[in-house]
Amino acid sequence: MLTITSFFGFLLAALTITSVLFIGLTKIRLI
């Protein structure tokens, strides 16, 4: 159970970081 929770936590963190980087690159391109 702990492993599954840690896996989802890591997946959520990776998704958040990817979204932030993607939005950042998009804003730089718009500018």
Swiss-Prot record:
The keyword Transport applies. It is a single-pass membrane protein. Disulfide bonds: none annotated. Signal peptide: none annotated. Its main location: plastid. One of its GO terms (molecular function) is electron transporter, transferring electrons within cytochrome b6/f complex of photosystem II activity. Keywords: Chloroplast, Electron transport, Membrane, Photosynthesis, Plastid, Thylakoid, Transmembrane, Transmembrane helix, Transport. Pfam families: PetL. The keyword Phosphoprotein does not apply. It is found in: Plastid, Chloroplast thylakoid membrane. One of its GO terms (biological process) is photosynthesis. The chain crosses the membrane at residues 4-24. GO terms for cellular component: chloroplast thylakoid membrane; cytochrome b6f complex. The 4 large subunits of the cytochrome b6-f complex are cytochrome b6, subunit IV (17 kDa polypeptide, PetD), cytochrome f and the Rieske protein, while the 4 small subunits are PetG, PetL, PetM and PetN. The complex functions as a dimer. Component of the cytochrome b6-f complex, which mediates electron transfer between photosystem II (PSII) and photosystem I (PSI), cyclic electron flow around PSI, and state transitions. PetL is important for photoautotrophic growth as well as for electron transfer efficiency and stability of the cytochrome b6-f complex. PANTHER family: CYTOCHROME B6-F COMPLEX SUBUNIT 6. Belongs to the PetL family. This is Cytochrome b6-f complex subunit 6. It comes from Oenothera elata subsp. hookeri.
